[in-house]
């Protein structure tokens, strides 16, 4: 939808906040604007604020809080000095216990409004570490000529700009406390203008940085990164092109993996692989999902969008057989290796694009008792429409987007005869508006 940012009245106005939007902004309806909705960053339900308009569109306006006139009792002082500028977090001003309450509300609203379904029971919200939890992410890097400095950080709320971060409390401390050193290192490079991003990922025993560079690094620049890695305990990878171009700079062998001790499983991964960002929540989520699936020793389970085997390999410790299917062939190769490394011969893996026709695939024709799926933000409707759903006793759906979960839940309940037994939010990304959730369906 087209938005106007320049030619409108930016005079601050006073308004009451009635709700919290799905992206963490306060919601107001302005009487002088005919009840038109305005989304206001930095505002909480129950507050009276002065806000400055930032954008207008036909159906809603946008604004930012400039003064809180009457504060919510749930408002707290943000821990981060960059809150309100950096887009990495949008909820630090809301009491931690209330953040997950808000996410539960977003989930239930989506299920009812989009899917036209209501769970028989609301699952207790699941939480893990709230600070220093983020073990995977991507920083933007930008040389600002006017300031004669390099910025390393997440995007600002205005995504045209990179936040100038001195610290980040949501990423693991080894990363969050060293952002200024990263910026200074890039600023001192010969190729300082050729680094658009730095990715980080942490295993249990190593933390890796992947440096995206548009031109070959000079020998001097490479040595600077090696010295930084040796001093601060990082592994450095270089990425001159696409994903396949990633290779180690120092050291040459990097043991990237994380353990799931409850199932005696160790999962190895590569620097750009997908892993769940919150290690403590991930372990709780796996316990939760397997319990909700009611996995039994004689079960055959299908695990769709299985990735490295995050759910598949723990399931293999519990059930007779599990089949994991994933669209990324590299992840499938790592999942197979992980099964072998962990001595699991009852886990099979297939590479398949689950947005395309898979009705003749070998794995599709096998019989299964239960289904677990953890799709991307786009959801799983395409593959759900192909599966022999009536053969599954129970489905556990792990979701990273409540809208696509709600759509798919509507299909399962209203068109395929399943019951939505329960659903609940999981706080994978505390202090952000991201809603992770889990839902359980049973065949009627």
From Swiss-Prot:
GO terms for molecular function: 4 iron, 4 sulfur cluster binding; iron ion binding; RNA binding; rRNA (uridine-C5-)-methyltransferase activity. PROSITE patterns: SAM_MT_RNA_M5U, TRAM, TRMA_1, TRMA_2. Keywords: 4Fe-4S, Iron, Iron-sulfur, Metal-binding, Methyltransferase, rRNA processing, S-adenosyl-L-methionine, Transferase. GO terms for biological process: rRNA base methylation. Residues 5-67 form the TRAM domain. [4Fe-4S] cluster binds at residues 80, 86, 89, 168. Its EC number is 2.1.1.190. InterPro entries: 23S_rRNA_MeTrfase_RlmD, MeTrfase_TrmA_AS, MeTrfase_TrmA_CS, NA-bd_OB-fold, SAM-dependent_MTases_sf, TRAM_dom, U5_MeTrfase_fam. S-adenosyl-L-methionine binds at residues 276, 305, 310, 326, 353, 374. CDD domains: AdoMet_MTases (cd02440). The active site is at residue 400. It catalyses: uridine(1939) in 23S rRNA + S-adenosyl-L-methionine = 5-methyluridine(1939) in 23S rRNA + S-adenosyl-L-homocysteine + H(+). Catalyzes the formation of 5-methyl-uridine at position 1939 (m5U1939) in 23S rRNA. Belongs to the class I-like SAM-binding methyltransferase superfamily. RNA M5U methyltransferase family. RlmD subfamily. This is 23S rRNA (uracil(1939)-C(5))-methyltransferase RlmD. It comes from Xanthomonas oryzae pv. oryzae (strain KACC10331 / KXO85). The lineage of its organism: Bacteria, Pseudomonadati, Pseudomonadota, Gammaproteobacteria, Lysobacterales.
């Amino acid at each position: 939808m087209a938005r106007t940012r320049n030619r409108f009245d930016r005079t601050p106005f006073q308004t009451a906040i009635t709700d919290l939007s799905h992206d963490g902004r306060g919601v107001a309806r302005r009487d002088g604007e005919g009840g038109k909705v305005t989304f206001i960053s930095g505002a909480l339900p129950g507050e009276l604020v002065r806000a400055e308009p930032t954008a207008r569109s036909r159906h809603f306006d946008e604004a930012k809080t400039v003064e809180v006139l009457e504060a919510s009792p749930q408002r707290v002082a943000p821990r981060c000095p960059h809150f309100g500028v950096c887009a990495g977090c949008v909820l630090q001003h809301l009491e931690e216990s209330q953040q997950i309450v808000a996410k539960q509300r977003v989930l239930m609203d989506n299920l009812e409004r989009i899917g036209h379904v209501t769970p028989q029971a609301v699952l207790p919200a699941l939480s893990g570490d709230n600070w220093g939890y983020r073990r995977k992410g991507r920083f933007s890097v930008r040389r600002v000529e006017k300031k004669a400095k390099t910025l390393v950080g997440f995007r600002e709320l205005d995504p045209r700009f990179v936040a100038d971060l001195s610290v980040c409390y949501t990423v693991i401390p080894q990363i969050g406390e060293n952002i200024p050193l990263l910026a200074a290192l890039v600023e001192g490079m010969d190729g300082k203008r050729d680094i658009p991003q730095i990715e980080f990922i942490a295993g249990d025993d190593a933390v890796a940085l992947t440096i995206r560079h548009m031109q070959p690094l000079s020998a001097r620049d490479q040595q600077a990164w090696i010295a930084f890695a040796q001093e601060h305990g990082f592994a450095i990878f270089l990425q001159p092109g696409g994903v396949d171009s990633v290779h180690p700079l120092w050291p040459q062998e990097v043991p990237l993996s994380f353990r799931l001790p409850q199932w005696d499983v160790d999962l190895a991964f590569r620097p750009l692989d997908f892993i769940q960002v919150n290690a403590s929540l991930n372990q709780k989520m796996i316990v939760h999902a397997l319990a909700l699936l009611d996995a039994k020793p004689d079960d055959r389970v299908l695990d769709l969008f299985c990735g490295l085997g995050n759910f598949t390999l723990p399931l293999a410790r519990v059930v007779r057989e599990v089949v994991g299917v994933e669209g990324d062939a590299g992840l499938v190769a790592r999942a197979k290796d992980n099964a072998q490394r962990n001595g699991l011969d009852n886990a099979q893996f297939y590479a398949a694009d689950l947005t395309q026709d898979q009705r003749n695939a070998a794995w599709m024709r096998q019989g299964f008792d239960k289904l677990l799926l953890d799709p991307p933000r786009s959801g799983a409707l395409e593959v759900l429409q192909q599966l022999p759903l009536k053969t599954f006793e129970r489905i556990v759906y792990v979701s990273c987007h409540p809208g696509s979960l709600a759509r798919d839940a509507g299909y399962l309940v209203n068109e395929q005869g399943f019951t939505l037994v329960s659903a609940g939010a999981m706080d994978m990304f505390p202090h952000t508006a991201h809603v992770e959730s889990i839902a359980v369906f049973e065949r009627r």
